[in-house]
Amino acid sequence: MRRVHVSVTGTVQGVGYRYTLQHVAQRAGVTGWVRNLRDGSVDAEVEGEDAAVDAVLAWMRQGPPGGHVTGTHVVELAPAPASAGTSFEVRRDG
């Protein structure tokens, strides 16, 4: 299992980034969350099997049509407790 925190910059708000990421994450079978930040970036946490996390990260670096990712910052985290969640959710803006 692998868990990462990701900050994404660029044109990533108002282009469907969070909801498309939720769909991509659910199809990959990972858990976590995504939210918009006030500075115009997107913040996310992704956890799952290594290959699934890598696939989601690859999508996050590209983003949806209409978006333009200029940077991603990935920080490796310790695995979450088993009770941390079983889905990938879109959170309220932070």
Ranges and model annotations:
Residues 1-94:
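Intrinsically disordered, low-complexity, mixed-charge
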